[in-house]
Amino acid sequence: METNLDGCFERVEKTLGSMIDSLAKNNPSQKLAEELLAAEAELSKSLKLLETHQNNNARLQQLRQETSLHDTQLKDIMSSLWNMRRELKAVPTTSNPPPGPKHQFTTSELLAYARRISRNTLPLPGVTNGVDMTPTQFSASLTEPEDSFRLQFQPTQTQTPTNSFNLSFNGTVSTPIGLSAPTPTTTNDTQPSTQLPPSQQPPPKTAPADDKLPAHLKPAVNPLHDAAFHPWPTEGQIRTGALAALQRLVDAGIEPRGYDPAEQERRRVAEEKARREAEERARLEREEAERKGREERERMAREREAARLRNAGGADGDGERRESVAVARPKPKQFTFLGADDDEDDEDEDD
């Protein structure tokens, strides 16, 4: 490739030099011009070939890099597949499916749960005020029940006055909606008048009575009027439900399965009764011990008193014997306040 390019460049240089010399000598040659064009075309062809060679070389380098990258990925994949195959072979195989139910609940339990929660999926009749909540009746639900009742029985303009009248709640007859009272026409002066005498004329028209319930009385008639509906139980209902009771048992460390509240209550009552009996027994034993200790103290006090009396009796006998032997001496008088009072009384009497 390099030799070919060098030859093309030399040929172009030689042809170009010859062409310049011929032009300088003012003797241009057509043959030299054709050779110059041929050398230029050959040089262009060689340059295009060089460009193709360089592109192919770059493509080869890129393919080598991609090949090495893919080889690395293939090695990793093969290593992963080999490890997975080894792990799969290490797993023990079973011929039969594992025993036991497939799910933790049965179909009957699922249906029973759906039946219990079905009452919370739709609002109560009092919340909707008897209005159909389907999409087709949504526009009609925007009116009050009393308005819908009144509109349902509203007569049309095609009805006759004899059979299309409304009775208000006060018993008066009102003119149908859309109809007016007949008025005598005066198109013909010769036509006889159809005016009735005053005694046979109908009573004057009165305004229809308002049959709508006042707003402040609607909550009294319907406690669920304008009540908020939630298709799920509230937090208070959940806290007072069975699930909350089971959670409290779990928090207390009690297994809910097989737990019998009646048995636990009976056991608690029995334990309370046993505790009270033990306390009563301990109290009786304590009182008995106190009684025995008190009796023992009283017995010891009586024994000490008897010993003291015996000792005092022996001392009195010895004193009497000594007094009989000794010379009789007058006993000293014992000073008392009563004696002094008697002497003062005697002195007062002498005076």
UniProtKB/Swiss-Prot annotation:
Bias-annotated ranges (Basic and acidic residues): 257-308
InterPro entries on file: Mediator_Med4
Keyword Transcription applies: yes
BP-aspect Gene Ontology terms: regulation of transcription by RNA polymerase II
GO molecular function terms listed in the Swiss-Prot or TrEMBL record: transcription coregulator activity
Coiled coil (residue ranges): 30-68, 262-311
Ranges of compositional bias, category Acidic residues: 340-351
A Pfam family: Med4
Cellular localization per UniProt: Nucleus
Amino acid composition bias (Low complexity), ranges on this chain: 182-198
Signal sequence coordinates: none
GO cellular component, one term: mediator complex
Ranges of compositional bias, category Polar residues: 163-177
Keywords (A to Z) from UniProt: Activator, Coiled coil, Nucleus, Transcription, Transcription regulation
Top-level taxon: Eukaryota
Region spans: Disordered: 156-217, 256-351
Family per record: Belongs to the Mediator complex subunit 4 family.
Assembly information from the UniProt record: Component of the Mediator complex.
Function: Component of the Mediator complex, a coactivator involved in the regulated transcription of nearly all RNA polymerase II-dependent genes. Mediator functions as a bridge to convey information from gene-specific regulatory proteins to the basal RNA polymerase II transcription machinery. Mediator is recruited to promoters by direct interactions with regulatory proteins and serves as a scaffold for the assembly of a functional preinitiation complex with RNA polymerase II and the general transcription factors.
Protein name, as recorded: Mediator of RNA polymerase II transcription subunit 4
Organism: Chaetomium globosum (strain ATCC 6205 / CBS 148.51 / DSM 1962 / NBRC 6347 / NRRL 1970) (Soil fungus)
